[in-house]
């Protein structure tokens, strides 16, 4: 998982979740922030993240700027791909990217995140990387992730086929 200008984290690409993980740290260092981002990857449900009503909502906290991104790199038996999450029209949106994570897709040579997701798209075009259209709804995102999309272009991005994904906490 990669945070770029997200949740008070300027940049972090060293969070590996491909084995056992143990988070420790004092209060306020980001343990719950990271856990909620992981949970949101699987359930894409802002209401089921355990964020109290007194706190900033998921969208505003994790995506405060036009260049705030969370990139999930997913490794499957068919290779790696990324899921870019970002804010558009005041909601979290997604774009599936048919490539492993590469910093230069999202950050320029001056170590500044690209200002908008359209700039990311232009860079992907420059590198000849395939990517999906923007996914605007959580339902469509979950259907793609869990193999229930009716569009064959998204089959390579499914983790598994499950019609019961709504049962994920």
Each model region followed by its residue ranges:
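Extreme N-terminal "head/tail" segments of very large remodeling/mechanoenzyme assemblies
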Residues: 1-134, 141
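Extended, Lys/Glu-rich alpha-helical coiled-coil stalks
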Residues: 129-169
């Amino acid at each position: 998982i990669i945070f770029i200008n997200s949740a008070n984290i300027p940049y972090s690409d060293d969070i590996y979740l491909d084995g056992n993980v143990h988070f420790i740290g004092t209060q306020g260092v980001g343990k719950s922030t990271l856990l909620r981002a992981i949970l949101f990857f699987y359930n894409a449900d802002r209401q089921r993240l355990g964020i109290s009503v007194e706190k900033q909502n998921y969208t505003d906290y994790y995506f405060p700027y036009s260049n705030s991104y969370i990139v999930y790199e997913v490794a499957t038996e068919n290779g790696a791909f990324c899921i870019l999450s970002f804010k558009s029209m005041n909601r979290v949106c997604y774009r599936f990217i048919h490539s492993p994570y590469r910093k230069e897709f999202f950050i320029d040579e001056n170590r500044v995140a690209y200002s908008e997701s359209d700039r990311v798209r232009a860079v992907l075009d420059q590198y000849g990387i395939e990517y999906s259209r923007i996914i605007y709804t959580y339902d469509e995102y979950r259907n793609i992730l869990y193999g229930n999309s009716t569009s064959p272009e998204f089959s390579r991005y499914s983790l598994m086929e499950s019609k019961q994904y709504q049962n994920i906490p």
